[in-house]
């Protein structure tokens, strides 16, 4: 209230009151990282356009949900990397042609680091608030080198082929400092650094042999030097060229104006940082942090806002459902494979979206993901209380255990992992020409009579 009175602006008692206001068209989310997802999600649900600070969310699973919902509701959503809307960045991209003729390797180097003397519960050091150097400032050189590597290859942005990282962790578990090496192609690589306990050069250098481009202030673009910024170019001929720029508008003003113009032109994404670019950035931030073996509490489903988002209730019904003889449940014409989800949060994100789209069949197997396919699906089914609404296809007796005696114990183990009473459909995962089909059928008939399965099928059988 004091802040509102000081600047003569309206204040609200809650997020819901704020988002329910008909006077608000768009919101800028600048909370600690851990609250980006919920604030942006609620804003999008209320059909408010969103400019959200980087990183968009705590992980790539949360960002998938936001981007998908924004596109579905035709709401503008932009991740706020302020340097993307500044003319200096456009100047950098326009000067990359100096590397067109080089046959040598191109190295992109970027750093962003500062020394913060803060307590362990400060957002920079608190894992519950999304602390750490990578999420706070490492995202800048990561996003920039992907942008540059992309334009060097005539792409909007580039996907690294690999990332390796080293660094130091805080006693709180967050990363204090990290260096990462990214390989984009046989010719293009990047080395990036970030820190929250060490002042770094905070610059961008692109080099290849005798050719180089140096940007002394790539992130703030002269915002704190009276708007003055410059790019130094060393040509192969030895000529040194400086491209200067004086900004009289302001870094963050430009970002706000860019977002506003996008909204006024009825765009749902920015042309300086697309939704695909944002999702790619989030994915590689995840990979970088995994390289550092950082354990983030919010990446556990019990702590994740994905659990509370209940995105499965957003029914778009894109998929047609039909009656399936032998079952008293509706079946979608498409089944979701539960074989490659990498975590609980990933599984909940994907399963929620599939169910919300009208998907009702989930296909798992005893061998999938070393049993985690069953476990993740079971956690989701029971958390969302959907056992009576969906159809579970289970499979067992895969080679080399494709024999009747393995079927029942593997079904029982799958049911234990799934924490459900029975499989709606059971399929033998492989065939075995050395075992008579009748022996498989006899075993399955007994299991069906026990009430452990309803329908019987086959998968990967030779006809």
Q: How would you label these PLM feature ranges?
A:
Residues 1-46, 310-314:
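N-terminal glycine-/serine-/threonine-rich beta1-alpha1-beta2 phosphate-ribose binding loop
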Residues 26, 32-33, 37-84:
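Beta-strand-loop-alpha-helix segment that lines the small-molecule cofactor/substrate pocket
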Residues 83-163:
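Predominantly a Rossmann-like dinucleotide-binding segment in NAD(P)-dependent oxidoreductases
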Residues 170-175, 185-257, 267-276:
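NAD(P)-dinucleotide binding in Rossmann-like oxidoreductases
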Residues 302-390, 449:
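N-terminal binding-site loop/beta-alpha segment at the start of enzyme catalytic domains
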Residues 345, 352, 401-463:
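Glycine/proline-rich, positively charged
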């Amino acid at each position: 209230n004091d802040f509102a009175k000081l600047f003569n602006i309206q204040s609200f008692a809650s997020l819901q009151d704020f988002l329910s206001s008909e006077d608000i068209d768009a919101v800028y989310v600048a909370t600690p990282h851990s609250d980006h997802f919920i604030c942006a999600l609620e804003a999008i649900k209320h059909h408010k356009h969103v400019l959200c600070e980087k990183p968009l969310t705590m992980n790539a699973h949360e960002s998938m949900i936001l981007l998908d919902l924004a596109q579905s509701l035709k709401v503008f959503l932009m991740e706020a990397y302020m340097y993307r809307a500044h003319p200096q960045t456009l100047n950098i991209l326009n000067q990359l042609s100096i590397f067109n003729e080089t046959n040598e390797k191109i190295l992109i180097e970027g750093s962003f680091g500062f020394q913060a003397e803060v307590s362990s519960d400060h957002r920079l050091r608190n894992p519950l608030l999304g602390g750490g150097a990578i999420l706070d400032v490492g995202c800048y050189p990561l996003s920039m080198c992907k942008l540059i590597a992309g334009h060097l290859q005539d792409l909007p942005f580039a996907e690294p082929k690999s990332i390796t990282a080293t660094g130091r962790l805080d006693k709180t578990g967050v990363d204090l400092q990290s260096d990462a090496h990214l390989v984009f192609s046989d010719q293009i690589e990047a080395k990036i650094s970030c820190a929250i306990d060490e002042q770094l050069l905070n610059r961008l250098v692109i080099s290849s042999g005798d050719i180089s481009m140096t940007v002394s202030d790539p992130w703030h673009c002269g915002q704190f030097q009276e708007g003055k910024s410059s790019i130094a170019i060393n040509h192969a001929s030895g000529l040194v060229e400086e491209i200067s720029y004086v900004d009289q508008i302001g870094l963050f003003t430009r970002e706000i104006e860019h977002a506003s113009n996008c909204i006024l032109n009825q765009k749902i994404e920015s042309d300086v940082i697309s939704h695909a670019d944002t999702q790619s950035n989030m994915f590689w931030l995840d990979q970088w942090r995994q390289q550092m073996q950082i354990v983030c509490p919010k990446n556990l489903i019990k702590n994740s806002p994905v659990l509370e988002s209940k995105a499965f209730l957003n029914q778009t019904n894109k998929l047609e459902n039909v009656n399936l003889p032998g079952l008293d449940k509706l079946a979608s014409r498409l089944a979701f494979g539960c074989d490659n989800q990498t975590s609980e949060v990933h599984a909940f994100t994907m399963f929620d979206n599939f169910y919300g789209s009208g998907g009702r069949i989930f296909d798992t197997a005893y061998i999938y993901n070393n049993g985690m396919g069953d476990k993740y699906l079971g956690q989701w089914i029971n958390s969302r209380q959907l056992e009576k609404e969906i159809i579970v296809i289970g499979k067992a007796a895969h080679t080399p255990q494709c024999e009747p005696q393995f079927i029942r114990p593997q079904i029982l183990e799958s049911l234990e992992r799934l924490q459900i009473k029975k499989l709606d459909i059971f399929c033998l995962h492989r065939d075995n020409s050395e075992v008579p089909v009748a022996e498989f059928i006899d075993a399955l008939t007994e299991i069906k009579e026990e009430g452990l399965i309803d329908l019987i099928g086959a998968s990967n059988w030779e006809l």
